[in-house]
Amino acid sequence: MLVPTVIEQTARGERAYDIYSRLLKDRIIMLSGEINDQMANSIIAQLLFLDAQDNTKDISLYINSPGGVITSGLAIMDTMNFIKSDVSTIAIGMAASMASILLTSGTKGKRFALPNSTVLIHQPLGGAQGQQTDIQIAANEILKSRKKINEILHETTGQPLEKIQKDTERDNYLTAEEAKEYGLIDEIMVNKKSN
């Protein structure tokens, strides 16, 4: 993927940044694509860096992701909760699966979606092969992950646990408006100036 470069004029002349580094200067982190360990490490490093720079200012986490590895996503979520800076989450395009958990784990009152965003909640996916005991261990781990994800959704949305268990039984796609009604986000962001 070609990463755009931004040229800025400074007192010392021109300075070139890749677009992501330039956005980071404005405390904006882009989470796009599949969530995995490599992406998680990058997002965590950016969160820690911005928090160390100034923990009184918000960090904006823009999310456009189909989801991914649960442990990688939970590592990002734990870091969002660990740092002192408020983390504003904004869904752009798609916040599916683990990405929807990150979206709803933003600072209360600062969780947004753009009008045409889609949010997907569902139970964890997984697979196993090997001996029966190995398959049983993997199945138990998926059940533990499902319980943990449902508890997070319960805490962040205020929805009853029984409703969340039912709603995540299968893929549950929500529009931005439906995500707001469900409690996954706080507001639909029509334009940046209004929020």
UniProtKB/Swiss-Prot annotation:
Its BP terms in the Gene Ontology are: protein quality control for misfolded or incompletely synthesized proteins
Organism of derivation: Lactobacillus acidophilus (strain ATCC 700396 / NCK56 / N2 / NCFM)
Q: What is its main location?
A: cytoplasm
SUPFAM superfamilies noted in UniProt: ClpP/crotonase (SSF52096)
Sorted alphabetically, the keyword list is: Cytoplasm, Hydrolase, Protease, Serine protease
Compartment(s) = Cytoplasm
Q: Which PANTHER family match?
A: ATP-DEPENDENT CLP PROTEASE PROTEOLYTIC SUBUNIT
InterPro entries assigned to the protein according to its UniProt record, in alphabetical order = ClpP, ClpP/crotonase-like_dom_sf, ClpP/TepA, ClpP_His_AS, ClpP_Ser_AS
Q: What are the record's GO terms for cellular component? A: cytoplasm; endopeptidase Clp complex
- Kindly provide the name given to this protein in its UniProt entry: ATP-dependent Clp protease proteolytic subunit
Looking at the record's lineage, which domain of life comes first? Bacteria
Q: What does this protein do?
A: Cleaves peptides in various proteins in a process that requires ATP hydrolysis. Has a chymotrypsin-like activity. Plays a major role in the degradation of misfolded proteins.
Q: Which family does it belong to?
A: Belongs to the peptidase S14 family.
Catalytic residues at S97, H122
| Lineage per the UniProt record | Bacteria, Bacillati, Bacillota, Bacilli, Lactobacillales
Q: Which reaction does it catalyse?
A: Hydrolysis of proteins to small peptides in the presence of ATP and magnesium. alpha-casein is the usual test substrate. In the absence of ATP, only oligopeptides shorter than five residues are hydrolyzed (such as succinyl-Leu-Tyr-|-NHMec, and Leu-Tyr-Leu-|-Tyr-Trp, in which cleavage of the -Tyr-|-Leu- and -Tyr-|-Trp bonds also occurs)
Documented EC number(s): 3.4.21.92
A GO molecular function annotation here is: serine-type endopeptidase activity
What's the subunit arrangement here? Fourteen ClpP subunits assemble into 2 heptameric rings which stack back to back to give a disk-like structure with a central cavity, resembling the structure of eukaryotic proteasomes.
Under Pfam families, the record lists:
CLP_protease
Gene3D superfamilies membership:
2-enoyl-CoA Hydratase, Chain A, domain 1
